[in-house]
Amino acid sequence: MAVLLSGQYSLPVSREVVYAALNDPDVLRECIPGCEELEVRSDGIFAAVVRLELGPLKTRFRGKVRLEDLDPPNSYRISGEGDGGIAGFAKGGAALKLVPDDEGGTLLSYEAEANINGKIAQLGQRLITSTSKKIADRFFESLTNRLQPNPRTAESQ
């Protein structure tokens, strides 16, 4: 089953800051919902263990993601795959673009496609798409919160 997702988020900081955060394993580990482990291997691949709940299915996915077509701080592509054991397998990619907005922040947009099989695919396209969108929204909400300028820092200067 193929799942298509796209989204757009406004972040309160420059493209350079957003791009750096999206390549920082500590930031990603903190912002990815259900992330239990995340490391950057010597070959540049991000390896992760993420606990997911998709409807009645709860599973741990072990996955690998590679960043490709790097154009800092404008864009890159993500390709990867994840194995959820008996729950199923997913493989896909996403294109991510960062554009400055009129207020000094960044407009982030993405388009993603994943191919899913196994028990997860039996849950149905609508449930998988809505759950995936919620996970993406939670990730970008966490990222936005992490990147918010700290008002106390500005006051203390």
Task: List each model region and its residues.
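Hydrophobic/aromatic beta-strand elements that line small-molecule binding cavities or substrate pockets
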Residues: 7-9, 35-36, 63-69, 92-100
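Intrinsic-disorder/low-complexity, polar/charged segments enriched in Ser/Thr/Lys/Arg/Asp/Glu/Gln
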Residues: 2-8, 45-47, 60-62, 75, ...
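Solvent-exposed residues in well-ordered beta-strands and their adjoining turns
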Residues: 10-14, 51-55, 68-70, 81, ...
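Glycine-rich portal/gate segments that line the openings of hydrophobic small-molecule binding cavities
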Residues: 39-82, 138
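Beta-strand/loop substructures that line and gate deep hydrophobic ligand-binding cavities in soluble
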Residues: 82-131
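Hydrophobic ligand-binding cavity/cleft-lining segments
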Residues: 1-45, 49-53, 103, 154-157
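Glycine-rich, flexible loop/turn motifs
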Residues: 28, 34, 53, 57, ...
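A conserved amphipathic terminal alpha-helix motif
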Residues: 119-156
